[in-house]
Regions:
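Conserved C-terminal structural/oligomerization subdomain of aldehyde/semialdehyde dehydrogenase
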Residues: 1, 50-53, 84-94, 202, ...
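A polyampholytic, Gly/Pro-enriched intrinsically disordered region
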Residues: 252, 294-299, 488-497
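N-terminal Rossmann-like NAD(P)+-binding subdomain of aldehyde/semialdehyde dehydrogenases
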Residues: 1-160, 203, 473
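Rossmann-like NAD(P) dinucleotide-binding subdomain of oxidoreductase/dehydrogenase enzymes
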Residues: 114, 145-294, 325
Length: 518
């Protein structure tokens, strides 16, 4: 690392895994980085299998709970209290985006992400760019514009009603492993912008990324006491939430549907969720050979980038019969070109090979189902056995076997390079729409068609929060310039845009001024 970077960051991702280079991740509590840590979890490099990180296994969280009481429910700031903090956070965003634009810092985070969540350089770079542009968007006055209020005339002289966006106060953020920079940074900044004080827990496998970015934010002027950062096991975090559920005003969770449901009950519904997505794409009847190459490329990108470890990854692909002969061979060819050498396919951090094989074998018991391509382990690698390493895989299931007893196992989300493909015809549209209606997760979707009537039929019948429509439609790659999040659930959390921040991180407050005269 260059000298200026060393002043900010404490871990060098460019150095090889030598004993002296094992990095100790630290917690941040009320502005102080922890110095002495007795219990740690050793994190293996997902590619080489060597230990390269030590992450605190925090078990005593009493101080974190005490800190919840240090932030009132009116927040660190609101439209009436401490408004100068809106300006301060705009300046922090400006400074952070400027530094993140420097090539050396951009490459630092790109490499750091790749070390803990191995994916292609372009995927890592895209995550850094989205984060940087988000910070640019909320530089200067745009933070206070998030808290814009409105007024309506009263019934008589001296009466006026005003609507405000109000913070929750002490909040909690739990972020996953698959986007170790983008997700925690965008949610933490959104929480701060609206006046909240967050406690942040990021998956321990990748938490070093947020640790380093938090150091950058503090370097850029963020008060170190504005955020608490804890590293611990999931069950410990669950116990922390259980013991402080009356003090946590809001929990924002990004992760699996099962954990989201448990936390929803634990917090009495004080939760905003961006849960796992079994995301579908439907390719319409308007086959056009000049579009096949692009449609195939986008399907491959959506299903297998980051080894399918995206909550927006294409899990269920409906292919109209008109496209079948031209499209499916192209998908197989594209998948075969993905190599571990450039991390177009790589370690799977939450599924083992055995779990994937068992799921495939379960699906193959469905009459007529078959593997179209893939279905085997990656060979000749040093990926540790606690992680998966699997070829990009597609399994075809007959359209008439989707509904009924098989539905639950067919729609089980595999957080890896795996998708279900179903070929359908016009006469099957009721089955297709019934399938989409029954899928419980409504994050992303794509309607790949320029047939306006077909678009209307599908869009009118579905609820996915981020839906792309048209021949260039995708399920992944959401930038910072549009809403990303599920729909159809009052607990849905958004990310990236002013609407997402306002919806997720503030509530409506009405103040009626009634001053007379008599």
């Amino acid at each position: 690392m260059r000298a200026p970077i060393k002043k900010i960051f404490t871990f060098d991702p460019f150095k090889k895994n030598e004993e002296r280079q094992i990095h100790q991740v630290q917690n941040l509590i009320w502005g102080e980085w922890t110095k002495e840590l007795k219990e740690n979890e050793e994190i293996l490099d997902p590619v080489s299998g060597e230990v390269f990180l030590r992450v605190p296994n925090t078990t005593d969280f009493s101080e974190y709970i005490k800190n919840f009481d240090k932030c009132p429910k009116s927040g660190l700031h609101n439209p009436i209290k401490n408004p100068e903090r809106y300006l301060m956070l705009g300046e922090v965003s400006r400074n952070a985006s400027r530094i993140l634009k420097e090539k050396s810092v951009e490459q630092y985070f790109c490499k750091l992400i790749q070390r803990v969540m191995p994916k292609s350089k372009s995927q890592c770079l895209g995550e850094v760019e989205v984060t940087r542009v988000f910070l640019e968007n909320f530089s200067g006055d745009n933070v206070r514009f998030l808290a814009r209020s409105f007024s309506n005339p009263g019934n008589y002289l001296g009466q006026e009603t005003s609507g405000y966006r109000w913070p929750f106060g002490s909040v909690c953020i739990i972020a996953p492993f698959n986007f170790p920079l983008e997700i925690p940074v965008l949610q933490v900044m959104g929480a701060l912008f609206m006046g909240n004080r967050p406690l942040v827990k990021v998956d321990s496998k990748v938490s070093v990324v947020f640790e380093q970015f938090l150091r950058l934010l503090i370097h850029c002027g963020l008060p170190a006491s504005d955020v608490d950062f804890i590293n611990c096991k999931g069950e410990v975090m669950g116990e922390l939430i259980k013991r402080s559920k009356n003090q946590i005003r809001l929990l924002q969770f990004t992760g699996s549907k099962e954990v989201a449901q448990r936390l929803s009950l634990e917090t009495f519904g004080k939760i905003k969720i961006e849960d796992a997505g079994f995301d579908w794409k439907i390719i319409g009847p308007d086959y056009d050979p000049k579009w096949t190459k692009h449609v195939a490329w986008q399907c491959d990108e959506d299903a297998y980038n980051a080894s399918g470890q995206k909550c927006s990854a294409q899990s269920f692909l409906f292919v109209h019969k008109n496209w079948e002969k031209d499209l499916l061979p192209r998908l197989k060819e594209l998948a075969s070109k993905r190599k571990l050498e450039n991390l177009d396919v790589g370690p799977i951090l939450t599924w083992t090979n055995q779990q994937i094989i068992e799921h495939i074998n379960c699906l193959l018991t469905i009459p007529g189902s078959k593997i179209l391509f893939g279905g085997k382990k990656l060979l000749n690698n040093t990926i540790p056995p606690i992680y998966g390493s699997f070829q990009p895989t597609a399994l075809e299931i007959p359209i008439d076997k989707i509904l009924g007893d098989n539905f639950k196992k067919i729609t089980k989300e595999v957080f890896g390079p795996f998708q279900i493909i179903v070929v359908y015809e016009d006469k099957n549209m009721q089955i297709v729409k019934k399938t989409l209606e029954n899928i419980s997760q409504n994050l992303t979707a794509a309607v790949v068609s320029n047939d306006v009537l077909f678009q209307q039929e599908i869009l009118a019948s579905t609820v996915n929060g981020t839906t792309y429509s048209g021949m260039k439609a995708r399920t992944t790659g959401a930038p910072q310039n549009h809403w990303f999040g599920p729909s159809g659930d009052p607990r849905s959390a958004g990310i990236g845009t002013p609407e997402a921040i306002i919806s997720t991180w503030s509530s409506h407050r009405e103040i009626i001024k009634d001053v007379g005269p008599l």
